[in-house]
Amino acid sequence: MQLWVGLGNPGAKYAGNRHNIGWMAVDRVAEDHGFAPWRAKFQGEVSEGVLDGEKVLLLKPTTFMNLSGQSVGEAMRFYKLDSTDVTVWHDEIDLAPAKIRVKAGGGHAGHNGLRSIHQHIGPHYDRVRLGVGHPGHKDRVPGYVLSDFAKADAGWLDDVLRGVSDGAPHLARGDGGKFLNAVALRVAPPRSSTSKPKAQDNREDAAQAAEERSETRTPPEARPEDTRSALQKLADKFR
């Protein structure tokens, strides 16, 4: 079994916060992949399901962010899991919005939710780092992550959540590369194979315009042959 933990704060007040993007991600996975209804357990809410043959328990701690480790530790001990069976989904201010990275182990980088998890299960767990951008100064970080996403963020946020849901089976199998590819296909879909680079379009447009000008240009009219004698030409000149 794998334990996937979505970090966030409980309550409607925090539901749309940047700090709650981890909750949003596991909610989307549960909804799209037919997981069981959420139920209260382990100082949080849990939902069980299967992703490509892998049993996964989703957990949303309701302890508030700074005590998330209590919930994670309790669930891990109950199922006799190792910390390497745990994947934590969390907001990441050091990544631009819509950027995602998968990481195995490491520090908590000042993230209070990760700090709490470190204290209860150690640092050797996996993370899905969900970029939300940085406010520009460290003093503004608390207010920034505890604020709702802007309306302008709705498009990329929906793409990211769809992408992580698409890629969830790959992540469950341990293929982080395919997981990230699935996200990328939602966030930055490839150009159509029939589309042409802009420069090529411009060159073709210019060539076509030149061809059209050439076709529509009226050639000069031919002058009739002058059959007059020299005497007639001289007489006509002085008329």
From Swiss-Prot:
**Alphabetized GO MF terms:** peptidyl-tRNA hydrolase activity; tRNA binding
GO CC, sorted alphabetically, is: cytoplasm
- Biased composition of type Basic and acidic residues is found at 198-239
- This entry's Enzyme Commission designation comes to 3.1.1.29
Q: Which Gene3D superfamilies match?
A: Peptidyl-tRNA hydrolase
Site Stabilizes the basic form of H active site to accept a proton: which residues? D91
- State the Gene Ontology BP annotations: protein quality control for misfolded or incompletely synthesized proteins; rescue of stalled ribosome
Q: What is its main location?
A: cytoplasm
Q: Site feature Discriminates between blocked and unblocked aminoacyl-tRNA: at which residues?
A: N9
The active site annotation covers H19 (proton acceptor)
Positions of region (Disordered)? 188-239
Subcellular compartments:
Cytoplasm
Q: Which domain of life is it from?
A: Bacteria
Q: What does the entry list as the binding residues for tRNA?
A: Y14, F64, N66, N112
Q: Which InterPro entries match?
A: Pept_tRNA_hydro (IPR001328), Pept_tRNA_hydro_CS (IPR018171), Pept_tRNA_hydro_sf (IPR036416)
Q: Name the keywords, alphabetized.
A: Cytoplasm, Hydrolase, RNA-binding, tRNA-binding
- Has the keyword Repressor been applied to this entry? no
Q: Which reaction does it catalyse?
A: an N-acyl-L-alpha-aminoacyl-tRNA + H2O = an N-acyl-L-amino acid + a tRNA + H(+)
What is the protein's quaternary organization?
Answer: Monomer.
Which family is this sequence assigned to?
Belongs to the PTH family.
* Cited function: Hydrolyzes ribosome-free peptidyl-tRNAs (with 1 or more amino acids incorporated), which drop off the ribosome during protein synthesis, or as a result of ribosome stalling. Catalyzes the release of premature peptidyl moieties from peptidyl-tRNA molecules trapped in stalled 50S ribosomal subunits, and thus maintains levels of free tRNAs and 50S ribosomes.
- PANTHER family, per this entry? PEPTIDYL-TRNA HYDROLASE
Name the record gives this protein: Peptidyl-tRNA hydrolase
Q: Which gene encodes it?
A: pth
